[in-house]
A protein has these predicted regions:
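Generic recognition of flexible, low-complexity loop/linker segments
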Residues: 15-17, 54-55, 68-71, 161-166
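A structural supersecondary motif
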Residues: 26-32, 46-86
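Second-shell loop/turn segments in exported
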Residues: 42-43, 82-88, 106, 146-151, ...
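C-terminal regions of mature proteins
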Residues: 1-8, 17-20, 114-180
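His/Glu-based metal-binding/catalytic segments typifying zinc-dependent metallopeptidases
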Residues: 2-54
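Short acidic (Asp/Glu) and glycine-rich catalytic loops that position anionic groups and cofactors
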Residues: 21-28, 33-38, 74-80, 95-100, ...
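M16/insulysin-pitrilysin zinc metalloprotease superfamily fold
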Residues: 71-128
Length: 180
C-alpha cells in the first residue's frame, strides 16, 4: 500500500486489450472512487448495484457465465469493479451493457437505503478475519480512508445518488481491460 494516490497514479483511465487465446470475450471495468468522495458511500453503492447487475445481465439477458459488480481496491484505488465474460458477445457489446446498466440503475429508495446501510454496518461490526484485519491496519497506517460504523451511520441517501452520478458521468476515469 502506498501513500495517498494522485488521481492518475497506479490506475490511469483508459482502455487496454489483453491478448488471450480463449475465444470468449472478457471485460473488466474499474470505476475509481472520485477524490473526496466517501468510502462508505462507495461500499453502499456497490451493495445496491451487485444484485441488480447480476439479475439484469446474468439472469435476464444471459450475457455469459461471469457477471459481477462489487467494491474492489485496485492499484491503491477504491472503486467499483464490473466484470463480464461471454462466449458470444464482443467486448464492445459487453462495455455497452455495463454503460446501459449504470444509466438505467434503479437506485434504492429510502427504505432500501436504510436496509443496505444496516447490512453494511453489520459487516463492519462483525469480527474480522486475519486478512480483513491486516487490510484495515494498512489503510490506517497509510492514512487511507477506513470504513467505520460511524461513517456508515452518518451516510445520507443523497450521497449515494451524488456518487452514482459522479462515477457514471466521468467515464474518462474508468479503467477498461478486455480480451476477445
Amino acid at each position: 500500500v502506498n501513500a495517498k494516490p494522485t488521481p492518475l497514479s497506479g490506475c490511469p483511465g483508459g482502455i487496454e486489450h489483453i491478448p488471450h487465446a480463449s475465444a470468449d470475450s472478457a471485460l473488466l471495468v474499474f470505476i475509481p472512487l472520485p477524490p473526496g468522495a466517501s468510502l462508505a458511500a462507495l461500499r453502499l453503492l456497490a451493495l445496491c448495484c451487485e444484485p441488480q447487475f447480476f439479475q439484469r445481465l446474468r439472469v435476464e439477458q444471459q450475457i455469459g457465465y461471469v457477471v459481477s459488480c462489487r467494491y474492489q481496491r485496485i492499484a491503491d484505488r477504491d472503486g467499483l469493479l464490473l466484470a463480464l465474460q461471454s462466449p458470444d458477445r464482443s467486448p464492445v457489446n459487453l462495455l455497452g451493457c455495463c454503460k446501459q446498466f449504470l444509466r438505467e440503475l434503479t437506485l434504492c429508495d429510502e427504505t432500501a437505503f436504510s436496509v443496505l446501510r444496516q447490512q453494511l454496518a453489520m459487516q463492519i461490526r462483525s469480527p474480522m478475519n486475519a486478512s480483513a484485519t491486516a487490510v484495515a491496519a494498512l489503510r490506517q497506517r497509510y492514512g487511507l480512508p477506513v470504513l467505520t460504523p460511524q461513517a456508515v451511520d452518518a451516510l445520507q441517501h443523497d450521497e449515494i445518488i451524488a456518487l452514482w452520478r459522479e462515477m457514471t458521468r466521468h467515464r474518462r476515469r474508468w479503467r477498461v481491460l478486455f480480451t476477445g
